[in-house]
C-alpha cells in the first residue's frame, strides 16, 4: 500500500476516467478527471490505450504530427495507418492502427487533463521529490513509459521512478483485509488514514485551465 511508505508516491489509474492520488505516507490527496475514450483505444478502435500513446509518440518522432498535434500534408484529410511493430519496436507483429486527426485531438485532451491533474496534486502537496509513480490497471501494465514522457503524459524526470502495479483495487482490498485479519493493520490506524484523505475537484483549482491548455501540446517536459 502506498501509504505504508514514508516517502512521496504518486498513483495513477487511467481509463475512461483518470483517478490519481499523491501521498507522503500519512496525508493523501486524491482527484479524478474525465479522460474520455482515448485511453481505452477510442470508439471502434481495436487497439489499447497504451498502444495509442506509443503510436502517437512514434508519429511525433517521425514528423507525421507536430507538437501541436497537427497532422502533416495528406494525413490531415486521409489519416494514417501505423504498424504496431514500428511504433512499439515489436518485430513480428502484423497489427496496425488507423488514426485520424480527431483521434490525435482526443488523445491530446485526455493527456492534458491527466497531466494537469498530476501537476495540481503535486503542487498541493508542496512540490516534493517523488520517490515512485505507480501505474495501475491494464493501461499502466502495458504503457511504454518512454513514449508517455515523449508526449508529455508524465514528466521526463519521473521516468525512472515509474512502475506498473497491476490490478490495485483487487490486490489492495486483499492486502488490507489480510493486514486487518493478522493485526498488522489496526482499525484505529485505518480510520485515521481514511480521515487524512483530501479529495479535490480539479475544475475548482487555481490555474487548472491554464495548465490544461499548456499540456495540450505533445512534448517532453
Give the predicted meaning of each segment.
Residues 2-6, 26, 57-65, 119-126, ...:
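Generic secondary-structure signature for well-ordered alpha-helical cores
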Residues 14-16, 72-79, 129-140, 190-204:
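A glycine-rich phosphate-binding loop feature that marks nucleotide/adenosyl-phosphate handling sites
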Residues 53, 111-119, 170-174:
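Short, hydrophobic/amphipathic alpha-helical packing segments
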Residues 2-51, 144-167:
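Glycine-rich phosphate-binding loop of actin/hexokinase-like ATP-binding domains
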Residues 24-29, 127-192:
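Catalytic phosphate/nucleotide-handling subdomain of diverse soluble enzymes
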Residues 54-109:
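Gly/charged contiguous loops adjacent to phosphate- or pyrophosphate-bearing nucleotide/cofactor binding elements
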Residues 3, 175-221:
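Acidic, glycine/GT-rich loop-and beta-edge segments that sit at the periphery of enzyme/chaperone cores
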Residues 106-128:
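Phosphate/ATP-binding catalytic cores across multiple sugar-kinase/actin-like superfamilies
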